[in-house]
């Protein structure tokens, strides 16, 4: 702004209120992450909600332990998957070793290689399930202050996804 040949300096005011949190572009992320474990058709088997600043690697084994018994072939119901396909956030040699000890074949993208590893052909099932869940606006944007309430709504959303898949198969 120019007035009478002089440049006026804009007044600076305090831009942050008392309820303003840290910048969302910092590495210390606000918010939450939803972790899903789905079968080959996209039906959620286990889910959890963690803070946005937590590593994904720490959540895969507890997620696998939450899988309920799944009936399939004759015999005992399965309690663990044969194979786990995950994105780069779960890339860890220690995690791969833990999965192999449990008899699970890990297919985890390497974070240091470029895109195009071929895992996208299997990972789209998880992304489609997230898209189904995000039709529920309550899960797309987290309005709940308490972790338990948001996880309960995620559980309801997973139940609705299972119900719709069952309805479509009849």
Residue ranges and their predicted role:
Residues 97, 101-103, 118, 122-170:
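Basic, amphipathic alpha-helical segments enriched in Lys/Arg and hydrophobic/aromatic residues
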């Amino acid at each position: 702004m120019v007035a009478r040949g002089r440049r006026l300096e804009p007044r600076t005011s305090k831009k942050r209120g008392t309820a303003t949190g840290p910048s969302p572009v910092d590495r210390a992320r606000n918010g939450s992450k939803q972790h899903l474990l789905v079968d080959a058709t996209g039906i959620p088997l286990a889910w959890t909600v963690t803070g946005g600043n937590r590593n994904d690697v720490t959540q895969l084994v507890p997620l696998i332990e939450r899988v309920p018994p799944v009936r399939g072939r004759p015999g005992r119901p399965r309690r663990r998957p044969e194979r786990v396909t995950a994105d780069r956030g779960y890339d860890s040699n220690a995690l791969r070793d833990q999965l192999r000890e449990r008899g699970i074949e890990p297919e985890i993208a390497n974070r240091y290689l470029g895109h195009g590893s071929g895992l996208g052909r299997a990972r789209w099932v998880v992304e489609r399930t997230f898209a189904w869940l995000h039709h529920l606006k309550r899960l797309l944007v987290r309005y709940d202050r308490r972790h338990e309430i948001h996880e309960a709504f995620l559980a309801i959303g997973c139940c609705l996804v299972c119900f719709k898949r069952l309805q479509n198969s009849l």
